[in-house]
């Protein structure tokens, strides 16, 4: 039975997103705990974040069958992974962050708009780095 288009595929995508977000939140919480002097708590957050990464990787391994959850492009081999990464970063710098910056500015959140515009520039740089890496692969 095909995974593509199934509820299981959507569940894997949702679980991947949740585990990925948990990883980043826990690393952020660990940094905060470090600043506050709670090194033992920071270590708990970091080790748990590592576990969440393993869970996310497991979901992504199953999703190789259906494509990148962010772009829908094929993933697995490095060349495909780079193409999916380029597409994702390109979307972020051409559509996502500019749109978010406009909304933030329209709502009077100029500092956040500036942040989003800065991130768009960073994402363009990421896309360019991935493109260079793709161009350097032996085909």
Q: How does the language model describe each region?
A:
Residues 1-139:
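Non-heme di-metal
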């Amino acid at each position: 039975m095909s995974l593509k288009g199934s509820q299981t595929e959507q569940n894997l995508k949702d679980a991947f997103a949740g585990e990925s977000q948990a990883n980043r939140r826990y690393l952020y919480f660990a940094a905060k705990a470090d600043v506050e002097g709670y090194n033992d708590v920071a270590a708990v957050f970091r080790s748990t974040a590592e576990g969440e990464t393993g869970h996310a990787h497991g979901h992504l391994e199953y999703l190789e069958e259906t494509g990148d959850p962010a772009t829908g492009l094929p993933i697995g081999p490095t060349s495909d992974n780079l193409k999916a990464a380029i597409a994702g970063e390109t979307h972020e710098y051409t559509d996502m962050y500019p749109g978010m910056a406009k909304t933030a500015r329209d709502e009077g959140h100029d500092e956040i708009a500036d942040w989003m515009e800065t991130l768009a520039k960073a994402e363009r740089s990421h896309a360019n780095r991935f493109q260079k890496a793709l161009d350097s692969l032996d085909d």
